[in-house]
Amino acid sequence: MTKPHCQLLRQERVDEFNRVAANETPDLADANLRGCDLRAADLKTADLRGAYLRAADLRGVDLSSAMLDGASIHEAKVSGVLFPADFDAAEIRLSIEYGTRLRSVVSRAKAIGATHQLTTSEV
């Protein structure tokens, strides 16, 4: 089942998406937005966790408050994109070049902490 917000973007009804999403957080978690032109979409606060954005056109999009953990931006056009501050450039580059899932600094720290706890408890 396709989510309503996702369906609007896949059908290139960006103006309608922006009207609907203006009063709520757009739910695009785990959405397949491969190849979509999202340049005019208001995604500033969107939930894009786990979204598949391969080859999507994100040029100039403000994602500064978007939830991006687990999203993939492989081969996406990202010139001028404002990414959240908790994603470093290396993480973004790896996702663009190799399709790795994005991890924020916070989620990486939690993963490292969990690994460290396991290692420490095994000693």
Where would I find each of the regions flagged by the language model?
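Tandem repeat scaffolds
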Residues: 3-8, 12-123
